[in-house]
């Protein structure tokens, strides 16, 4: 999903709709699309319990934080800090789910992060947070790591309920961030810009984010959080290739090496047997 998400964001920003408000539009339109289904499945929503709100805040909050970080810091730094997710996921899975951290997982993470650094051509040292946008990107990656652990720990909650919670709670997070008095975040754009952008926002939110996030949520219920984080690194491969094709950006030897490293990390992880976990009670 993240590998091609830059395309609609760039298109909407060219149309003068800030990314902050685009994120709110994406999530609110997706939540509106899923609302009738949620009403039909209200029994399952009630059975999932109030803990579903926590799941929604984590699953929806991570991507919203990432989109906002793109507005507040350099894209490369936002990507680097957000995609530290495999590290957090592996540590949290060990603490919460008691998954073993094997040497092969460590090798896969190091290989993936090396590919990340090569692909993004980092020349300014370690990706440490330096400004508000950096911290938001880091928080977004950590939030998504928490989300993947929670989804894995509660497989008895159906993906549809988690998906609706993701967009409903993500809408609230996006609105709060859009209204915060951060100077770099743009105010609500004029009505003519909103009206012109609305069809694209609805199409992207309801037509793209809903199926993409359903697959991610469904997979996260079944896979180890660390594995999910490593597989999501492959989004950067899609991003690099799509940027080279559609935006005429460079794709040379360095990019090929980065792609090979990231792909190798994913293949190494897939080749391993997945650990089992003991699910949490549905009330948590």
How would you label these PLM feature ranges?
Residues 1-4, 41-77, 82, 118, ...:
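Specific transmembrane alpha-helical segments of multi-pass solute transporters/efflux pumps
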Residues 1-21, 65, 110, 126-153, ...:
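Glycine-/small-residue-enriched transmembrane alpha-helix faces in small-molecule transporters
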Residues 3, 35, 56, 60-64, ...:
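Hydrophobic/small/kink-forming positions within alpha-helical transmembrane segments
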Residues 19-36, 108-111, 135, 150, ...:
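Hydrophobic alpha-helical transmembrane segments of multi-pass integral membrane proteins
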Residues 25, 79-84, 151-170, 209-245:
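Helix-helix packing/entry segments at the starts of transmembrane helices
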Residues 38-65, 132-140, 188-211, 232, ...:
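Loop-to-transmembrane-helix transition segments
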């Amino acid at each position: 999903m993240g590998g091609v998400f830059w395309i609609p964001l760039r298109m909407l920003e060219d149309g003068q709709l800030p990314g902050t408000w685009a994120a709110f539009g994406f999530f609110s339109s997706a939540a509106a699309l899923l609302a009738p289904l949620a009403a039909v499945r209200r029994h399952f929503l009630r059975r999932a319990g109030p803990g579903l709100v926590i799941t929604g805040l984590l699953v929806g909050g991570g991507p919203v934080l990432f989109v906002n970080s793109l507005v507040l810091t350099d894209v490369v730094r936002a990507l680097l800090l957000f995609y530290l997710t495999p590290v957090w996921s592996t540590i949290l899975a060990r603490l919460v789910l008691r998954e073993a951290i094997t040497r092969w997982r460590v090798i896969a993470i190091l290989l993936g992060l090396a590919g990340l650094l090569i692909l993004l051509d980092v020349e300014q040292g370690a990706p440490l947070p330096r400004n508000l946008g950096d911290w938001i990107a880091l928080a977004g990656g950590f939030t998504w790591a928490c989300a993947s652990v929670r989804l894995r720990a509660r497989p008895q909650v159906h993906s549809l309920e988690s998906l609706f919670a993701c967009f409903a709670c993500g809408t609230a997070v996006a609105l709060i961030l859009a209204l915060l008095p951060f100077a770099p975040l743009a105010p609500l754009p004029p009505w003519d810009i909103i009206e012109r952008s609305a069809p694209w926002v609805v199409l992207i939110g309801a037509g793209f984010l809903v199926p993409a996030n359903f697959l991610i949520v469904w997979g996260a219920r079944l896979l180890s959080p660390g594995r999910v984080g490593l597989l999501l690194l492959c989004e950067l491969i899609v991003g690099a290739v799509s940027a080279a094709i559609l935006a005429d950006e460079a794709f040379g030897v360095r990019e090929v090496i980065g792609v090979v490293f990231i792909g190798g990390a994913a293949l190494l992880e897939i080749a391993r047997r997945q650990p089992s976990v003991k699910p949490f009670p549905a009330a948590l």
